[in-house]
Amino acid sequence: MAVLNLKRETVDIEETAKKDIKPYFASNVEAVDIDEDPDVSRYDPQTGVKRALKNRHISLLALGGVIGPGCLVGAGNALNKGGPLALLLGFSIIGIIAFSVMESIGEMITLYPSGGGFTTLARRFHSDALPAVCGYAYVVVFFAVLANEYNTLSSILQFWGPQVPLYGYILIFWFAFEIFQLVGVGLFGETEYWLAWLKIVGLVAYYIFSIVYISGDIRNRPAFGFHYWNSPGALSHGFKGIAIVFVFCSTFYSGTESVALAATESKNPGKAVPLAVRQTLWRILVVYIGIAVFYGATVPFDDPNLSASTKVLKSPIAIAISRAGWAGGAHLVNAFILITCISAINGSLYIGSRTLTHLAHEGLAPKILAWTDRRGVPIPAITVFNALGLISLMNVSVGAANAYSYIVNLSGVGVFIVWGVISYTHLRIRKAWVAQGRSIEELPYEALFYPWTPVLSLAANIFLALIQGWSYFVPFDAGNFVDAYILLPVGILLYIGICVFKSNHFRTVDLRSINLDEGRRKDMEADLSDQESSLASSETMKDYKSATFFRYLSNIFT
């Protein structure tokens, strides 16, 4: 029998035993102490978080986690501002960028699953300053999402129980989510798994309804197909509307990259991460493109309900059901949005708290945020990040509501910053890999279309970060202009500050001196026969990187 090491070589167990080295995976040999061996330890040795997420958790977290209130409610605002064509273009183009980013994540995180994801890798392969900019931009993105979802959740419950004030619902659920997150990552993964299935089923049900509705099979209504693309039209505000929709779409795609963070707490990142990455195109087509097509087909962009004050009523799903003649459908949609809100808050707390934990381990945040209890739960980081969500209470006051809306809208440019850093870091890792004489064949996962995917993503994210506030130029809107661009100068100042006061230089790391084996590990539950067969199967990277794009498409569903 043979066992697998990091270089995918085989060694004889008997020979290994003579050398007094414990094999990782062998059914007839005593198991290694999982707390002593860093490769298969139950806890990440660099951050202390527990490795409890299963393959199915990671897979459904990536697939169902992107179906949030933004897609169900916020996309209606995007439809109103841009029209169905703008929505389709926005989801398609941002989807191409998201696909490129996920290919980069697949290569980076499968190679280096330990230690904290892309912020840690940005420090190792660039400097101390880059992860600060990327990490805090990521915190801002999910802080904005968290505050918005607390407010959305409370608004939904007020739809049914208006006698309870908005702040009452916010405080009740603040404590509930705090307690839930402190239980542990295993419960988080299991809960998100089942919530993801509910969201997928709900979205597919809406697609089926849409097909029946536009085909004229509801209450003998005539078929109208894509009539709303002609009247009132495909675009509501021309190119300006398209520019606005791009910012919306970038926010809706945020969280796609969270697989990189979850890998640190995954039992088997070598299997889970590639599986999640291969599902990216599936997510883009079924979730985002599907939403763009069916929203544009069932709801005209000038429907007055898209600007309704009640979040439930301005959901395109609720509007379509109401237009079909089912007035009580708003309650069903309300329940569906409630499920997505619970999942979105849960996911935002997880992503934001782990990002703070990793920043603290890099010396870029207070050390207390790096502390985890004996169960691997980063209690201080969870509590601090959850406390940031209380800014949603500002929306209770009429005077503070405008300030609240500006804060929530910060998330758009933050996504472009994070994605740009991920793509740049991928280029640096590959450059270091080649500079030290490593073979591309050694990579456990090779990004499709490299180097075009990271280069395209980097260029596109820089471009979109610079033009995403274009709609506020004429007529000039000072408040929204500052809101659109404030993170860019703040990020530059943060970068300079870290270089001056922490690093004492502006140099980047020497790629030839980096330890390329640091941060690599084996899967905890890898089975020898599975590992050997996977190396010979069509899912391995030897076949994957030599396959055509159509071969790649066929592997997405396996």
From Swiss-Prot:
Topology with respect to the bilayer: Multi-pass membrane protein
Regions of this protein lying in the Extracellular compartment:
79-81, 148-168, 215-241, 302-324, 397-402, 468-480
Name the major location.
membrane
Named from the GO MF annotations, one term is: amino acid transmembrane transporter activity
Q: Does the keyword Nuclease apply?
A: no
For this UniProt record, give its keywords in alphabetical order, as a comma-separated list: Amino-acid transport, Membrane, Transmembrane, Transmembrane helix, Transport
A Pfam family that this protein carries is AA_permease
Q: Which residues lie on this side of the membrane: Cytoplasmic?
A: 1-57, 103-126, 190-193, 263-280, 346-375, 424-446, 502-558
What is any one of the record's Gene Ontology cellular component terms?
membrane
* GO biological process, any: amino acid transmembrane transport
Transmembrane stretches in the record are 58-78, 82-102, 127-147, 169-189, 194-214, 242-262, 281-301, 325-345, 376-396, 403-423, 447-467, 481-501
Q: Kindly list the places in or outside the cell where this protein is found, as annotated in its UniProt entry.
A: Membrane
Q: Which InterPro entries match?
A: AA-permease/SLC12A_dom, Amino_acid_permease_CS, APC_YAT
Mind telling me which PANTHER family this protein's record contains?
A: AMINO ACID PERMEASE (PTHR43341), GENERAL AMINO ACID PERMEASE AGP3 (PTHR43341:SF26)
Family per similarity comment: Belongs to the amino acid-polyamine-organocation (APC) superfamily. YAT (TC 2.A.3.10) family.
Query: What function does the entry list?
Result: General amino acid permease with broad substrate specificity.
Write down what this protein is called. Answer: General amino acid permease AGP3
Q: What gene is behind this protein?
A: AGP3
